Amino acid sequence: MKAGIHPKTQKTTITCGCGATYEVLSTKENIRVEICANCHPFYTGSRGATRVEAGSRIDRFRKKYGR
């Protein structure tokens, strides 16, 4: 690699909105994210309101068409 053309990497702290912090190497000093693997519904297994809405739609369909 050529000397002097690559950005300087440093230890960086990534901070999530849920309070989780991660240390990685990056060219930026601090990084803030809204959602991470610690609080994302896909990784935590919680579906929240989306599942309730889908259930009520299915119930309305069954009530309307008698199935």
UniProtKB/Swiss-Prot annotation:
Name a GO molecular-function annotation: metal ion binding
UniProt keyword annotations, A-Z: Metal-binding, Ribonucleoprotein, Ribosomal protein, RNA-binding, rRNA-binding, Zinc
Assigned GO CC terms: ribonucleoprotein complex; ribosome
| Entry's cofactor comment | Binds 1 zinc ion per subunit.
Q: Does the keyword Ribonucleoprotein apply?
A: yes
Query: Any keyword Acetylation?
Result: no
What is the required cofactor set for this protein? Zn(2+)
Q: Report the InterPro entries cross-referenced here.
A: Ribosomal_bL28/bL31-like_sf, Ribosomal_bL31, Ribosomal_bL31_sf
For this entry, list what GO says about its biological process.
translation
The text of the family note is:
Belongs to the bacterial ribosomal protein bL31 family. Type A subfamily.
Q: Which PANTHER family match?
A: 50S RIBOSOMAL PROTEIN L31, CHLOROPLASTIC, LARGE RIBOSOMAL SUBUNIT PROTEIN BL31C
Q: What does this protein do?
A: Binds the 23S rRNA.
How is the quaternary structure described?
Part of the 50S ribosomal subunit.
* Alphabetical list of NCBIfam families matching this protein: L31 (TIGR00105), PRK00019.1 (NF000612)
- What name has this protein been given in UniProt? Large ribosomal subunit protein bL31
- Species whose genome carries this gene: Symbiobacterium thermophilum (strain DSM 24528 / JCM 14929 / IAM 14863 / T)
Gene name linked to the record: rpmE
